[in-house]
Amino acid sequence: MSRTRTTPGRRVESDVVDIGEHEFESGEILPDLQVAYEAYGEFDGQNAVLVCHGLTGSQHVAGHGTESGVSGQARAWWGDIVGPGKALDTNDYYVICVNVPGSCYGTSGPASEGPDGEPWGTDFPPVTVHDWTRAQRRLLDHLGVGRLHAVVGGSVGGMNALDWAVQFPDDVERLAVVASAARLDSQCLGIDAVARRAITSDPNWNGGDYYGEDRASPDAGLGLARQLGHLMYLSKDSMERKFGRRSAGRGDRGDAFPSDPAAAFFPYREVESYLDYQAEKFAERFDANSYLYLTRAMDDFDLSEGYESDAAALAAFEGESLLVSFTGDWHFTTEQSESLAGAFRRVDAPVAHHVVESDHGHDAFLVEPEKVGPPLGDFVDEGVAGRAVTDTATDGGEPDEEKDFAPVHSSLFSR
């Protein structure tokens, strides 16, 4: 059901649209693809900005005062960036965020009802980032939105944004890729693989067939997967500052694995308590099969697939680009963003690589809006010439080969 709310300075659309038959990259066809979106502000024909959400994010990119019973990235996950008077100013722009296929916030995915009236489960077609982009394009067509003023994405949403520059290069004027990369490295691929195995090893997963009130969900496996994710999203420095080796005290929570009798002798540390809390909250809001589907889509993405190089993949894109990276992010490093900036430069595409000094790890793009907002807002308004936009290139327009991106942490597990 479509809902539109209008308050001073803010208009919000929230809807789920049936875009009809949709063929996935795998060749499988869904007869009726449902796509959930939210849009903020007024469309004037030229001011549309598409925001691509992160792995477990939703279309609820900004708050509108009516959310209840949701948490994490399901609820206003970038509310300090999107809204009236903010970096993506909804007084000026028509900001759209689309829940991607395979997710579980209204767009068709494994938990959605299939043709037989039962949830799809693992019979749902495999999804790729390319599938996300094409579904977004069809949703925008339905809304009457043609060329986009900007596409903005963080984390895997940045990969989604990059895919727009490849699949629909003429449809994007400005591209902002925040805390992302052209592909995952082998360490992140390995961590994602272990996270998926945590889910599929949970007896309650049952081959993906766990839906129904009379069945238990694989919450333990999904929780472990989320805990791995949180370790990947934080930096060593931020974890040490936040938790250290402090004991949380057992209280009523106990250990995550109470069957281990030796655990009673040892302290239950604050970092464990934090991870257990995050696991519990995540299992309440997210679907385990969706986590499998979306991590595979992220792992599969490679900007240069089908091309000789990243630069060749971007050759048709003539718009301006902003890359934002964070020095403490080892999930998507500053070096990866600099390599991507080099690909844009090799095809003479206007690009700025803005490096943010931060020790908050990958989560910095969510938790430090005061550092992300100014360059992002100025770029969307003014392009790479925006006042708050900096670049790693020298005055001559070439990258500074001597640039050090300290303090980069290559891994939480380095010695």
From Swiss-Prot:
InterPro entries: AB_hydrolase_1 (IPR000073), AB_hydrolase_fold (IPR029058), HAT_MetX-like (IPR008220). Residues 387-415 are annotated as: Disordered. GO terms for biological process: homoserine metabolic process; methionine biosynthetic process. Residues 47-369 form the AB hydrolase-1 domain. Its EC number is 2.3.1.31. It comes from the Archaea. The active site is at residues 155, 329, 362. The keyword tRNA-binding does not apply. Pfam families: Abhydrolase_1. Substrate binds at residues 226, 363. GO terms for molecular function: homoserine O-acetyltransferase activity. Keywords: Acyltransferase, Amino-acid biosynthesis, Cytoplasm, Methionine biosynthesis, Transferase. Pathway: Amino-acid biosynthesis; L-methionine biosynthesis via de novo pathway; O-acetyl-L-homoserine from L-homoserine: step 1/1. Belongs to the AB hydrolase superfamily. MetX family. Homodimer. Transfers an acetyl group from acetyl-CoA to L-homoserine, forming acetyl-L-homoserine. HAMAP family: MetX_acyltransf. This is Homoserine O-acetyltransferase. It comes from Haloferax gibbonsii (strain ATCC 33959 / DSM 4427 / JCM 8863 / NBRC 102184 / NCIMB 2188 / Ma 2.38).
